[in-house]
Amino acid sequence: GLGFESLAEHGKASDVCLKLFCYLWTMDRFEKYEDDLVDRLVVLCTGRGLMDGMLLSSPDITAKWESLALEYSGDAVREFNAYPEVVLAWTAYIGMAVACWWDKDWGRYKDQGYSSLVGPRGFDDLDEHVTRDILKHPLNSKEAADIAGNLAFLAGDAYSFMMRQGAEPQSVDAFNIFRHTLSAMYRVGAAIELKALRYRMEKI
């Protein structure tokens, strides 16, 4: 793995991660990595009927990730070594939730934080809370099962892609790859939901 064990020791993962995010956020040397990963995931999503060959987006949704990432980073770092693909899939669920909020009433939901995305068990049932309470799909529905299956597939591919970068564990490069992978999964999750809500790109 990318070796975040030392960050998670003694319950200090959140504080350390917040500082790292603030310090590293302006670094852009890994933007091409993120773009390449997004392009790859768009192809996979299109093959599964989740997209039409392009990444739907909105400036509001994209900008919202920065504040959510600062809150989410503590849980993401703590859980990543044991459950890397879960962390990546959960990030896509967050993107789907924000896209749903944006569609429903952005003025009402734009200030919602990470705590609004987790269920009674916190990080552990984020997927169920988003699916049932935000996207409004019963947990036993085909829609819920399809979302879970698709996001698990995409998370697995994204994890393989990030591992192939060969970053040294616990290095700055490893952390940058990690944060850009989260950003990519968020953007892809949002685009999947926008497509499900029947948005589409149009020439102007």
At which residue positions do the language-model features occur?
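Intrinsic-disorder/low-complexity detector
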Residues: 17-204
